[in-house]
Each structure stands twice: as C-alpha cells, then as structure tokens.
C-alpha cells in the first residue's frame, strides 16, 4: 500500500517473547494474518513464546524478522545466544528511544547490527497518530514488495532521519 505522501505500508506485527523484548515480522498480509492466528494462544505474559520457538515459527513463513528496540528495558533479547541473534534480518532503531538517550541508543543498536552483520532501520513505534514520523527510514529507491525492501536494506541504500520535533512526538 502506498499513501499519497509516498509512505509505503507493509503488513507486519510485533510479538512479545518470554525472555523480554519484542520481535518484528514483515511480510505478505496472508502470512502475517496466519502468524497472528497461530500466536493467539501466546499473547499473555505467562504464555509468551521463547525466542527460539518464535524464530522457528517465523522461519516457516516468507517474512523478514527483526528485533524491535533491542536495548529498551526490560527487554533482554541482546543477551540471548548468538545463534539466535544471527537469525534476525534487521534491528530497529526506535523513535521512542531516541529522545531519551539518542547517543546510547544509536551506539548500542549500530554496534549490535555491525556484530551481526545486519541492517539497522528506523521504527517510529507509532501507537498514536502524533508519533508518526518521529523517525523514518528513507530508501533511495522505491520498494513495492517485501523482497525489494529487503534488497534495499541489505544494500544499505537508505538513510535514517529523526524529526526535529521527535522529543515532543513520543
């Protein structure tokens, strides 16, 4: 879906894991809807899936998998075994964290991305309309499909832009 202002919207969801933290998946609408249905029994804190189990499930679908705001407390995803972390396609540099401690958030997230050799892209963590656009990933080329999006991420053909008003948006 592409909006009049050029914003592309790809289906996705965020899933809580037992270790603490949030895992993102982006892919075809049918895959996201089916994953959401299959994860229905695991949406309460005491039933969150372990990271390894969730990644096993996600690997059965044509989705990109990322770690949302990896260094936000109380998340513990970066402390998980390296063999699990290497299963991520990308990390999220999250807009909600930027106004609080931008230097730390960027330093830690970029360092983990480099260690894992995966892209770090922006996520606005938009739960309310005012938060939209506090941080953006701007791609050099248009992406109409998830595979095109992944190709541009892998090629590094994007910039991350933080809005001047971000501290007031989140």
Summary of predicted features, one role per range:
Residues 1, 39-41, 170:
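Charged, glycine/proline-rich intrinsically disordered loops and linkers
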Residues 23-62:
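Binuclear metal-dependent hydrolase catalytic cores centered on His/Asp/Glu-rich metal-binding motifs
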Residues 13, 68, 124:
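Active-site flanking residues adjacent to catalytic metal/cofactor-binding acidic residues
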Residues 3-8, 17-33, 73-170:
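Charged catalytic cores and adjacent phosphate/nucleic-acid-binding surfaces used
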């Amino acid at each position: 879906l592409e909006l009049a202002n050029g914003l592309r919207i790809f289906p996705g969801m965020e899933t809580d894991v037992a270790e603490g933290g949030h895992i993102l998946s982006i892919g075809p609408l049918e895959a996201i809807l089916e994953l959401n249905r299959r994860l229905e029994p695991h949406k309460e804190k005491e039933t969150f899936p372990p990271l390894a189990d969730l990644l096993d499930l996600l690997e059965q679908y044509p989705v990109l998998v990322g770690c949302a705001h990896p260094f936000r407390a109380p998340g513990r995803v970066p402390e998980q075994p390296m063999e699990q972390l290497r299963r991520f396609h990308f990390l999220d540099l999250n807009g909600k964290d930027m106004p609080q401690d931008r230097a730390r958030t960027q330093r830690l997230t970029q360092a983990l991305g480099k260690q894992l050799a995966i892209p770090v892209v922006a996520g606005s963590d938009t739960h309310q309309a005012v938060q939209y656009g506090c941080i953006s990933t701007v791609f050099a080329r248009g992406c109409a499909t998830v595979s095109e999006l992944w190709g541009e991420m892998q090629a590094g053909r994007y910039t991350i832009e933080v809005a001047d008003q971000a501290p007031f948006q989140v």
